[in-house]
């Protein structure tokens, strides 16, 4: 397979948390993580499983969403959407929504948003990547192994887009 093209979609969320307690260190805890949705389509099987003359084009989009569950608790969703095509035909399509519940305490307001939208998805990513690799392998293809994703860059791009939109 050709190296996949990853298209990050910037995270969006409005997040709030209590003011930090003076003298206390910020704390980030994983309360749980879980698979919310998984879909794998192999629409042209068994023909798609035959040896191919050319490597498929693989496009992957990545999206992060978060929401408050309580004063210091957040759900963070990591959405991975992968599609492999050859000559305009879909070879396989996979859609994964993996999430975690996190407790963030004693984070200053200016660090809360980056912690939730950078650090939390960074913790979820290895598990989501493994599920996607297993799904493609179980679909009869080589495992789709994604390179690590720089969630900091995704976050910074979103901030730049928001600033550009605000100035326009």
Per-range role (PLM):
Residues 2-123, 127-168:
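N-terminal intrinsically disordered, cationic/polar leader segments
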């Amino acid at each position: 397979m050709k190296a996949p093209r990853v298209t990050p979609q910037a995270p969006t969320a409005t997040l709030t948390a209590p003011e930090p307690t003076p003298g206390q260190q910020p704390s980030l805890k994983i309360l749980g993580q879980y698979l919310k949705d998984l879909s794998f389509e192999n629409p042209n099987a068994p023909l798609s499983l035959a040896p191919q003359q050319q490597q498929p084009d693989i496009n992957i989009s990545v999206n992060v969403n978060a929401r408050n569950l309580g004063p210091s608790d957040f759900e963070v969703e990591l959405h991975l959407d992968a599609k492999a095509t050859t000559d305009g035909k879909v070879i396989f399509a996979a859609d994964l929504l993996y999430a975690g519940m996190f407790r963030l305490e004693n984070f200053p307001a200016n660090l809360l948003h980056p912690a939730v939208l950078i650090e939390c998805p960074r913790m979820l990513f290895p598990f989501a990547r493994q599920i996607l690799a297993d799904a493609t392998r179980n679909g009869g293809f080589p495992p789709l192994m994604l390179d690590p994703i720089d969630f900091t860059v995704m976050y910074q791009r979103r901030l730049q887009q928001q600033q550009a939109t605000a100035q326009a």
